[in-house]
């Protein structure tokens, strides 16, 4: 059976929708694009008119009632932001906006500026009302940024939408976050083949290929977005929410294999910047996730449960 695909640029990412050819496949692609545009309007921290930005604009003013999808992602993000030693913090928006790494107006904030902004990045300042589905940022100038989670969450929503249409197989690649569902009918073992980027080399160079089925692969790396300041130093985009500066780490890339793409987002962010020992121990302790760690000097570490998926 022939694969058909549609690629669009949205939310600062290239998005691939891959389905097997079937009746009305082009209309299905059109409907998915409409959904993606709707989710951009809901989750984006870079669109001043998005539903998320309505929360941010009302920081220190009043609670904002939001769609259940947005509320659920914020609720999930807050839980994992408050976890011990987590490097995920959805309240880090002011720090991200200060650096702007990945945008044309990127800069290096002053230390005084960063220290002042850190005072309004405590996720405890996010007040949630489950019955009303309202979100209130209790400090002025607070900002939620869901950039570490939204792509995976949206990919999962799209997969659920396609399954509800009765579509049995497909693949979504949302800016490098890959989620598959159903059998890969074009492969004898019915598994999809996903290349894992070598973070120490140019894009398209893989450290391995993974065989996956009804699973997601999410990779985070310091190679993705960088900025060279007037001081001549190069800064990557993965910020440490505790210091306000790019995380200092021996890790160049971290890949998480999970059932849900949002879980891959959560754990790549929670773990990136931890020691290799901590990351590998966590991967062995949590049965729902597997992973691959690549260091800046090119060493590769695999969790035990992922080894039978690796094609080198």
Features from the language model and the residues they span:
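Mature catalytic core of soluble alpha/beta enzymes
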Residues: 1-312
